[in-house]
Amino acid sequence: PPLARNAYERYIHRLLRENDLYGHVVFTGSLNAQQMKERYLKSQVFVLPSSIENSPNSLGEAMLLGVPCIASDVGGVRCLMTHGVEGLIYPADDPHLLAYDICEMFAHPEKAAQMARAGREHAGKTHDAQKNLEILHQIYTEIAR
């Protein structure tokens, strides 16, 4: 196990050790955009286990790349996906339901793939850089008047 640099890392490493999870978790360190894309595409499921979020870019990125997604019900997550349609959403304070949802993704790969396709299509609309730039430009133009 790597040397933990702070209390949170020590906590994470303790959990990994206690649950015999070393070898199942990868700490990547900093990644450039291409490396991040490669990691996303190697993933069988993307999990956003946040307790606080606004509009999580990482969720949008995973959806755009067609990775099945599970996210905690915080911030703007419900604006990015609908539970059971583009992915799964669970209460942020329910780790047991998160574990269940992860197992469901693996137990039903056809359903996971269907949600991933729907997520990719939806994110293609909500995360279209050119469209979002035009909308922002229009908003700022209106404000400036």
Segments predicted by a language model, with ranges:
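Nucleotide-activated donor-binding/catalytic signature segment of Leloir-type glycosyltransferases, i.e.
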Residues: 9-30
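Short alpha-helical donor nucleotide-sugar binding micro-motif in glycosyltransferases
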Residues: 30, 38-43
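Short alpha-helical segment that forms part of, or immediately flanks, the ligand-binding pocket
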Residues: 37, 56-64, 78-79, 85
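A short hydrophobic beta-strand element within the catalytic core of glycosyltransferases
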Residues: 46-47
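Aromatic "clamp/platform" in nucleotide-sugar-dependent glycosyltransferases that forms part
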Residues: 51
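Short hydrophobic beta-strand element within catalytic cores of glycosyltransferases
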Residues: 68-71, 81
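Conserved acidic donor-binding segment of nucleotide-sugar-dependent glycosyltransferases
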Residues: 83-84, 88-95, 104-109
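A short, well-ordered alpha-helix in the C-terminal region of glycosyltransferases
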Residues: 97, 104, 111-126, 132-138
